Amino acid sequence: MQDVLGNPAGVSSAETWGSWSEKADLGLNIVIVDDQMSARTMLRHVIEDIAPELKVYDFGDPLDALSWCEAGRVDLLLLDYRMPGMDGLEFARRLRRLPSHRDIPIILITIVGDEPIRQAALEAGVIDFLVKPIRPRELRARCSNLLQLRQQSESVKQRALSLEQRLLASMNEVEERERETLSRLARAIEYRDGGTSAFLERMSHVAGLVAEQLGLSEEEVRIIEMAAPLHDMGKIAIPDSVLLKPGKLTEDEMNVMKRHPRIGYELLSGSQNRFIQVGALIALRHHERYDGSGYPDGLVGEAIPLEARIVAVADVFDALLSARPYKEAWTMDAALAYLYAQRGRLFDPRCVDALLRGRAQLEQICGQFSTASARPGV
């Protein structure tokens, strides 16, 4: 025997819902769209009998239903094909255009023999069909199955999102370790050259500021900031008698000093790490000059990699602000005036202009990473 809704005698609709519902979050929304009130009432009655926790919303006007769906969450949609104003196929097409509703299960209610309509419905995104006259037991079974699949799909999405977040956190941790390693390596070279970590931090952030003002992507700015401190890596192979000499270098000593870009490149090249790859390029080219007067290869203009042109400006700006045994620290105004005077000669005009546009941020950077031997004074 069966009850009036088609359940076997003694078996409730809640029991036919399936054991999965015992552990599932039943905050699911079912939307019914049918212009006939009697049909909506019957559908609502059957669906609410599946489980009392389900929330059912019914609409006689397809446009009202579509407006509600645009703003609300939908887990299952029952849709009549023949409705005035907008048929079920057009409704399905419009719903599928909404990014958050592209995978909602849709059941289309049709009449027997509507095979062309079925084909068009599948193309419009309909998942399943109910044929009039609707049998309550079949309606419950189809809704239960699709809701179960919907719940499982959402669970998989949440798990994937959680795994993605954990992976991103792990990648960030690895990147932070790489950043620290590169920073300490660069600081070792800077200490040997008589500088401090504040100089490196300042130069790195100035390079990032120039890159940002040039309109580079956030990722490109980050890579340049991390790679910039590696620019003088080759100085590790320069003798102290040359590197630490307080006076002017002789021609022979200058030739020795000019080896450090290639040495730095050789030390850093061949890495699979993106930051070190860019660092190798910067190490090799940061002493090239826009007019071709630089070294090691006398490259001209945009033949010099953009990363190196950016770091060339940041490096000289930082060097001018830094006190050394052979010179006093310059003020920020004097340093910027020098860079402007050399735009188009030693430096890429776009990079100099980018630094000048970021004057406010530049003052903040210099204030944050100022030292006793550097005067950012304006």
UniProtKB/Swiss-Prot annotation:
Processing and modification events after translation: Phosphorylated and activated by RpfC.
PANTHER family: CYCLIC DI-GMP PHOSPHODIESTERASE TM_0186, CYCLIC DI-GMP PHOSPHODIESTERASE TM_0186-RELATED
Compartment(s) where it occurs, according to its Swiss-Prot or TrEMBL record: Cytoplasm
Species in which this protein is naturally found: Xanthomonas campestris pv. campestris (strain 8004)
Role summary: Member of the two-component regulatory system RpfG/RpfC, which is involved in the perception and response to the diffusible signaling factor (DSF), which is essential for cell-cell signaling. Detection of DSF leads to the positive regulation of biofilm dispersal and the production of virulence factors. Activated RpfG degrades cyclic di-GMP to GMP, leading to the activation of Clp, a global transcriptional regulator that regulates a large set of genes in DSF pathway. May also directly control genes involved in biofilm dispersal.
Name of the protein: Cyclic di-GMP phosphodiesterase response regulator RpfG
EC number, UniProt record: 3.1.4.-
Catalysed reaction equations from the record: 3',3'-c-di-GMP + 2 H2O = 2 GMP + 2 H(+)
Alphabetical keyword list: c-di-GMP, Cytoplasm, Hydrolase, Phosphoprotein, Transducer, Two-component regulatory system, Virulence
Keyword Metal-binding included in the entry's annotation: no
Result, substituting Y295A: Decreases interaction with GGDEF domain
Entry-linked CDD domains: HDc, REC_RpfG-like
Gene Ontology cellular component terms for the protein in this record: cytoplasm
Effect caused by changing D232A: Does not affect interaction with GGDEF domain
HD-GYP domain location: 174-371
Domain Response regulatory: start-end pairs: 29-147
SMART domains xrefs: HDc (SM00471), REC (SM00448)
Pfam family, one: Response_reg
Entry superkingdom: Bacteria
